[in-house]
Structure formats: C-alpha cells, structure tokens
Amino acid sequence: MNFFNAEHYRAVKKFVCKLDGARILDIGFGNGVTIKKLSKNINAKFYGVDISADMVEKAKRENRDGVNTNKVILQQGKAEELPYNDDFFDTVYTVNTIYFWEDTAKVLDEVRRVLKDGGNFICTFYTKGYLDKLPYCDSGFDKFTPQQVRSMARERGFHDVKVKILSDCKAYCLVGTKIEGE
C-alpha cells in the first residue's frame, strides 16, 4: 500500500473491521501491506489472489507472521478464475485493480460465486476523469465512471449497491451485497 491507497485502505477497513471470525478475500493484493494491516487488527482469516508471481512472493514476505500461523493465505491466480469454492467468503474486496481486469463482467460473476449469501463486495477505484489527467494512465487501464461501476455491479446481480465518494470526486468505494433468490 502506498500513500495514494491510504484512503482506499480506510474505506475497506471500515467495512471489514467487525467481521470477527470471517473469511475475507483481497483480489490483487500487490505488496500485501493492506492485508498485513487488516489482519493485525481483525480476527479473521485473510486470503489473497494476485496475478503477479513476484507480488505473491513479496506479499508472503511482508505477511510472514500471518502466513506462518495460517491466518493469511496468498496465491497466484487471475481475478477472472478465482481458485476458491462457491459461497466461501464473507467479504471480498479489491483496491485499485478494476482497471486491469481482462473481463470485468467475469470478475464480478466470480466474486458473486465465491461470496456467501449476504456477503459484501467492496471495490475502491479512481474515476475515469481523474485517471485521464495522469500521464502514466494513457494505456493499459480500463477507466470507469462511478455510474458505470455501479451499473456493472447491478447487472451482475449485486444488491443494495452503493458508491461513496472517498476524496474530491476522484476516488470512490462501491459496496454491493450478494443476495440469493432475488
């Protein structure tokens, strides 16, 4: 986690801090600092999947204590093919990864599949308007407005979808719930 993700981390922490005994998945954990911070303060089991083998190794080193006690389980994999059983997680979160997914609809379907009924999906992201102003975001980023992210989550079956502003209309946090039978 870097300075730019600090606000995103606080948003995720707000939603997972009361999940005592839960199973929580981080999609695209990068260097693993967010998992480390959350796992130190929350009595839950943390799982993570990241496409980069280098990041998996770095995050395992960063989370050595949690990995050694089996509180943190990290593995390489794609968000479009989550390597977990159906209805396994109480919460799934992702911080600034939506831009890099090959197939956003497939990832959202996978998140719904691995979430338990009543489980929440938390997705923090910077808006298209903000990213368009950054020179290093010219290519390799799928950029979305908050309305687009909300619509995609609803289309893929999430309920009670809310998008909250994190900072100056440039960063947002989406929260959606999996409800079966509706």
Residue ranges and their predicted role:
Residues 3-21:
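Conserved alpha-helix/loop element of class I SAM-dependent methyltransferases that forms part
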Residues 91-103:
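A short SAM/SAH-binding and catalytic strip from SAM-dependent methyltransferases
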Residues 141-156:
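Short alpha-helix
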